[in-house]
Amino acid sequence: LKHFNFKAMFSMDYASNNGRTYLPVMEVYDDTAAGDVVTLGTGKTEVSQFKENETKVQSDYLLTYTNSFDHGNHNLTATAGFTTYYNSLSRLDGARKQGVGLVIPDDPDKWFVSIGDAATATNGSTQWERTTVSMLARVIYNYKGKYLFNGSFRRDGSSAFSYTGNEWQNFFSLGGGWLMTEEEFMKDIKWLDMLKIKASYGTLGNQNLDRAYPAEPLLSNAYSAVFGKPSIIYPGYQLSYLPNPNLRWEKVEAWEAGFETNVLRNRLHFEGVYYKKRTKDLLAEVPGISGTVPGIGNLGEIENMGVEMAASWRDQIGDWGYSVSANLTTIKNKVKSLVQDGY
């Protein structure tokens, strides 16, 4: 179709990692011990193995419409898209110590957990999946190349907030610019090549967490206990971390205003921006209790503000060209709060 362009992109990254570890019997000199030698640890050789597979899949589907109207005075670009991201990991670990009198040899061909004493076997595993889905739209418009507008909207969903009812969140941005040097009243200023005033406001989110299921209560092994007559050993379990069924997206609101200019036949470029960013529902760790690993909560609000400036000079002298640049950034950080009801 005329004025339309469709783009589909797909990528996949698969990684497989496996390894083996051998722990020999370690002996150290000790002149106070019999034979002047002390054996460290259990005094048994040990082997361990692990295998880990990780998959990452990204897909993007973008439909773009581009057109100009009224002899090129009105220029429009509109994009609609759908993106997905999937990440999964699976890991299995195992270890065994030697049997009585059966030393595991220091030979990589024999470093397998099946060679050790089955009574000393230990194992563990890790498995998780994460998915992000986004629907987005963007519009870019300019009138005669001097009045510039853009706007975007996206709806993001993340499996990090599964079971909370807060999987989906909307975000948007608006921006505008004025290329003043395209105005008739600026044409007589010969040393000023370009001057643009710009401003924008937008929101975005963060769902990056160091665990896959922060809202779900996961159990891990703990100390065993003995009960009853005859005595029976019961395995113990504890919460791996404090689950949070109310967890939601971290949200960032940001706005900035500034200008860009080129002078002296475009040799000198300068730009300055004042910005302010406020992060709400900050994802942070909740202090652990009773020995548990800290959980994750939306605990605070942080505000950043400052100025960004950059300047560059570029020139040509005969066949020799050179450029010089410098930049300056200031930031004022303020923690507005680090508290939430219930903590």
Say what each PLM segment does.
Residues 1-23, 34-343:
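Extracellular/periplasmic, surface-exposed regions of secreted and cell-surface proteins
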